[in-house]
């Protein structure tokens, strides 16, 4: 496992330490899930250049590291590659006894990966099942640890909601420094340029400006164009002084950038857990 180091400075009297992983992409299926998902599991594992067993072991190793080193464990989503009972059961069993936070990823709700337009209606086909296997609230959750308010929330389809903004305002009133934990990173100029150079078709970021997404194809433009509720959430976060940092995933490449909001806000994007990446984060 390749573990990088990252530090957020928020003015704490004592350090808070955690292990961040993201995009583990478990690819398990058995007879309960059916022949189609068994075939999907094999094909998807091969797409990540590993066997299903190797992907499982990389996830298990990250959780074991957090337990052994008494670190809070943070996942910013895509623990699963697709919805299956085998994936859900392995994830729950592996996380048993681990102190963890979680922001869901888009693959947490993916039934067959790429077979349909994914939106809120699509998500609701599997949301209740998926939520039942994880302790944190996957829509919006918040937990204060060592004087830091870790806010974990769903932006898996590049959007935020009015409900999440309402909850965010409530958390801001508590007066603790906030670390926002999401699956899809916020737009930041250097990250945008890096992702466009790496992928070539789009940057896979939340709330990228119109002029930055105009070059996307029709599917990606529709998928990643920010709606009014998303822009309202980002505007609040940008102006809220308690927001001190952002931790995200989704891009499969480790990257650190700074959001040039009304103040500088650091953002860490984790490397892919399916490739054995993790980050030990110190908040002081």
Where would I find each of the regions flagged by the language model?
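Extended active-site neighborhood of metal-dependent phosphoesterases/phosphodiesterases
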Residues: 6-10, 84-179, 197, 202-207, ...
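Short, solvent-exposed beta-strand-terminating loops
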Residues: 13-37, 109, 181-204
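Residue-level marker for buried hydrophobic side chains located in beta-strands
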Residues: 18-20, 73-75, 102-103, 180, ...
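Short active-site segment of divalent metal-dependent hydrolases/proteases
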Residues: 26, 80-81, 108, 149, ...
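Charged, glycine/proline-rich intrinsically disordered loops and linkers
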Residues: 33-50, 119-127, 196-224
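His/acidic metal-ligating clusters that form di-metal
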Residues: 59-72, 149, 158-258
């Amino acid at each position: 496992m390749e573990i990088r180091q990252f530090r957020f400075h928020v003015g704490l009297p004592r350090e808070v330490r955690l292990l961040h992983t993201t995009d583990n992409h478990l690819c398990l299926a058995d007879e309960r899930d059916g022949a189609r998902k068994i075939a999907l599991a094999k094909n998807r594992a091969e797409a990540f250049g590993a066997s299903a067993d190797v992907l499982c072991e990389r996830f298990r190793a990250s959780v074991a590291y957090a337990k052994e080193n008494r670190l809070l464990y943070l996942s910013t989503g895509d623990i699963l590659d697709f919805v299956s009972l085998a994936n859900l059961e392995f994830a729950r069993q592996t996380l048993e006894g681990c102190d963890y936070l979680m922001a869901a990823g888009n693959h947490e709700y993916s039934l067959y990966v790429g077979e349909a337009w994914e939106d809120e209606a699509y998500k609701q086909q599997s949301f209740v099942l998926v939520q039942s296997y994880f302790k944190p609230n996957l829509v919006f959750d918040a937990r204060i640890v060592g004087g830091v308010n870790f806010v974990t929330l769903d932006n898996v389809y590049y959007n935020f909601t009015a409900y999440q903004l309402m909850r965010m305002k409530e958390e801001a009133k508590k007066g603790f420094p906030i670390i926002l934990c999401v699956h899809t990173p916020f737009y930041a100029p250097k990250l945008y340029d890096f992702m466009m150079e790496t992928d070539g078709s789009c940057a896979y970021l939340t709330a990228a400006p119109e002029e930055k997404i105009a070059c996307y194809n029709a599917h990606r433009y529709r998928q990643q164009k920010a709606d009014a509720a998303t822009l309202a959430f980002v505007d609040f976060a940008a102006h809220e002084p308690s927001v001190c940092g952002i931790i995200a995933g989704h891009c499969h490449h480790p990257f650190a950038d700074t959001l040039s909001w009304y103040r500088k806000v650091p953002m860490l994007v984790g490397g892919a857990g399916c490739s054995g990446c993790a980050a030990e984060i110190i908040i002081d």
